[in-house]
Structures are given as C-alpha cells and as structure tokens.
Amino acid sequence: MTEITAKTPWAGHTGDVPLHLDYFDGSMFEALELVAKKYPRNIAFDFMGKPTTYPQMIEEIKKCARSLKTIGVRAGDKVTIAMPNCPQAIYMFYAVNLVGGIANMIHPLSAEKEIEFYLNESESVTAITLDQFYNKFESIRQNTKVVNIIIASVKDELSKPVRAGYMLTEGRKIAKIPKDAPVIRWKEFMNMGKACFWNYSVKRTGDDPAVILYSGGTTGTTKGIVLTNRNFNALGQQIIAANPMFNPGDKMLAAMPLFHGFGLGVCVHTMLSQGGRCILVPRFTAKSYAKLITKYHCNFIAGVPTLYEALLRLPSMEGADLSSLKGVFSGGDSLSIELKKKLDKFLYAHGAPVQVREGYGTTETVTACCLTPPHMFKEGSIGVPFPDTYIKIVEPGTDQEVPYGTEGEILLAGPTVMKEYMKHPDETAQTLRRHADGLTWVYTGDLGTMDSEGFVYFRGRAKRMIVSSGYNVYPGQIENILDANEMVQMSCVIGIPDAYRMQKVKAFVKLAAGIPANDATRQALMSYCSKHIAKYAMPCDIEFRDELPKTLVGKVAYRVLEEEEQAKHAAETPAAPAEEEKK
C-alpha cells in the first residue's frame, strides 16, 4: 500500500472529529439493510405527512428490484431516474443498486433535448418519471435505446385525505396519459415482481459504479460523473463523523433534489444509511420549507444561500421555534460574510443553539468534502476536510503547493473521489492526477487559500460557470444553443447579480444580417430557448448588440460584459445610510 505523505495542517483543529475512519465495503443497498435491521422501529422517511419505516422501505425496494429483474434490467444496465424527492424515487434508486445496475440521475424539469442527451449518453435501458413529465419523454423516446418507461404519480404515495386534496388541486392540472400509451404504470410495475422466482440480488463491492450525476466538469461541457458505492457510503460515514451531535432518528429536511450530489448523498443516503429520518420535500418553496422545519422539529437542514436569504424574509418565520436544530449547513454557492451574520443572528433569535456551517465540494467528490467544524469558526472559511479527505492549494494546473495564505487552485483527494467521467477519458486524465504524495487529486478549477491550521477559504471559480440558486449553469452550453439558431450570428452568456438567486442568466446576442432587433425577435428566441434549456438555466433577458466586445485574440470578452452589468447593478443599488456605514 502506497504511503500517503500529504500535509494535514488541520490535524489538531477538528475537535471530536477523527482524522480516519474504517469504511463499509458493500453496496449502498446493503448499508441500508444493515441499518434497517439495527433500527427496525425507526421511520426512514416522511412524505406529505405519511411516514414509512425502515422495514417497510426495504420491502418496497426488494419488490421494485424483482420488478426490474422481470422487465429485463441486468447488472451494469443504466436506469434513468427523473423524479422529485418522493418515495418511488427512493425505492427505484436502491432497487437499481440491488440488481447491480447504475442509477442515472437527471433533473425532471430538463428540456426535451437535454433528456434525450442524458438517455443516450448513459445508454439507459429503462427510465422512470412522473406522469406530468410523460409527454417530454414520449416525444424523444424513438431517438433513444430506452426499452421501458415507468410512469409514477405523486398521488399513489399519499394518504387518503391528502390524496383527495391533491386531486382537487395539483392533480387536476396533470394531463391524462392515454390508456394505450407504451408505458408501465407504477402500480402495474410493482406487481410484475410477483413473476420473479429467481435471484434478483447482485453482489456489489465498494469499487463498483453505482450512480451517474451530471456536471460541466473542468471545461463546462456536460458529462456524466461515475460514482461508486464506496463514494456514497464513505460520504455517509464522513458526514456523521463530522457531526458528533447526530443521533439515529434525527430528522433532516430533504429539500435538495436527488439529481444533485448534496440532495442524494447527504439529505438521503447519509440519513438512510446511518439511521436518520428524511423529510422528503417534492417541490421546494421557501414557505413550505419553513413550515416543515417547525412541523417536524427538524434537527438538520441544508441549503444554498438563496434559500436562507428567502427564509429571512418570510413573515411565517417570525415566531418560529428553531430550538430543535443541531446543524444548519450552507453549500452550492459562496455564502457571503454578511449573509452568514444575518443568519446566525436569526437562528439565535429563534432559539437555535447553532450557527450556520459552510462547506465546499464538487460533484466529482459527490458533494461536500469539507465543513466548518462545530467548535471553531473562522470568518470567510469553508472549514476543514472530512476524515480521510485531503485538500491542498497549488499553482493552477500544476502539482506545486503554494505557501499558506497564498491563492491557488483547490485540489481534493479522498474516498469520495469519482471513478471517472463517463466516455471522456481525456478529461478524466486531466481532472484526476496521481501525485508523488500517494494520492489521486481532483483538479477543481476553483481558487482558494489555506491557512496554517488547515482552514480553507474559497476565492472564486477559475472555470467559467454561473451558480444560480445553487444550480451550476454553463454559459458555453447556452451559447451553443443560441448560436445554432438561424437568427443569431453570435452570443455571449453571463451571470448577473440577483438579490434572490445570487446570479441569474443573461444573454447578449448579435443578430444575423436582416433580423430586426425587436420584441418579436426576442420572444422568438426566448421560446426557442425554452425548448432546449432547463428552466433554472433560462436567460432572464436577451440584450441585442450590434457588436460584442472582443479580446486581443478575437474571443468574446465576457468579462467586459460582466463588468458593465456589475456597474449597472451598483448604480441601481441604493447606498447605505451614513449611520449604518459607521456601524
């Protein structure tokens, strides 16, 4: 075994958190099954007021696995899951793992062309989605190799009183699927397992691929990140070790989506593999989030800065009792020092005995791999690494470490590092590099510093990326879509300041000769974008320019446009009163 010689300046500053752990080497499902046997009376998750125990969950997962086997899903097959946070998504995710398949997790609100790309890139043989998204899947199905589409409905997992209300409101808006549609409905699918009389369980180890999540990687082009059983199981153990105050049965509000590493890895798998209880939130609104925190007396909540900004403004939170909270985590985007101060003050005023703890990570490491320790806060820091995780700061693109306090590229290593980029060996080799210290490092493309006690400070993204409400938006992808339109000669996409989302997407377009720069053209381009771009990545505005600024080598100077927008935003933002400035 190679000796690890990487520096660990954070040793001695992690409090009760150990530096090393012994990791479970089985599958994700096996981790759940062990916990279910250990805590047979514990509730695994709640959905719209309906609780499900660990034994009930395991039984449903096994039924789902038998049904997958019956329709022909085999070891190594990819199954696309395009679902919100709901019970069927949980059952399918772990059932795919149980039969030895790989879960391909995608956003259910993705545009049709994006869905087609995800299905083909992963070579999925089966897909599951909700009834309200049926038309998107059916319209592109013939362009893929998908054999079976399983259609679930939220109403199937609701208690009778809640179901009645749902059918009178949200359920009425969903178009009925034709009876002869070539799909398998969830209830029908789950009954298919009764025909499975052979072994449906496939033995898997920690090193086996288990999940595909999507990210722009180091270049901004969408690619699948292949993650293993060990990646997820290790993350679960690390999260619990980094939070010694956790007890089995503690409740986490699971509002972050399942196609996101944090939602899947922390809010769901960490809790379910460690005996916790997930409060599943199928559709996020700040109002519903706030209501659930107090209704269930949640112990842990996690979100992006946008979410917390919204919570501060909610009238319903004025008298809320937050004394049950043990951990409040922020990630997905940089948390400003001022917002953290406001949040900490808000938590204190509402009886919470904790402060916001900021973390940092990438999809290449599932999600967070460092976190502010519970006993020690440093202003502006994103914390220290999890057990067995290593972080170092180097001259960008090299293996040369920079002195403490000097800005450089953030590199990550540890048990949650991805297996590879699917079908992109060159980018895998560019992102994962073995060093003389015995570790394989992820080159994040992000800039930061580290102090002499091992605390890390995030400084910015070296790669061009917009973070809007915690979602990663890659300008290059949107520019490619715009440039493909015959009305467009050239485009440039940037992120502009937004009080709620932190950043929103704006497109600058140079139109093709003869195309009028008017509202009709703008609306036509917006309509075109809506068919090709997910809602969270849609431009909020398209501004027409006769020419786009260029760099000396002829590239579009996006930084010039960013500076223009920042100056415009600063001019529109009222200055603080003199009295406040003195404070």
List each language-model region with its residue ranges:
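Conserved AMP-binding/adenylation subdomain of ANL enzymes
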Residues: 233-251, 259-302, 310, 314-315
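Conserved AMP-binding/adenylate-forming core of the ANL superfamily
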Residues: 41-86, 90-94, 111-116
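Gly/Ser/Thr-rich phosphate-binding loop
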Residues: 298-303, 312-379, 390
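Conserved pre-ATP/AMP-binding loop-to-beta segment of ANL
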Residues: 176-214, 221, 244-251
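AMP-binding/adenylate-forming catalytic core of the ANL superfamily
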Residues: 110, 127-129, 301, 414, ...
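Conserved ATP/PPi-binding loop(s) of AMP-dependent carboxylate-activating enzymes
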Residues: 384-388, 400-433, 473
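Conserved structural elements of the adenylate-forming
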Residues: 58-63, 191-194, 206, 225-247, ...
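Conserved AMP-binding A3 loop
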Residues: 53-55, 201, 210-234
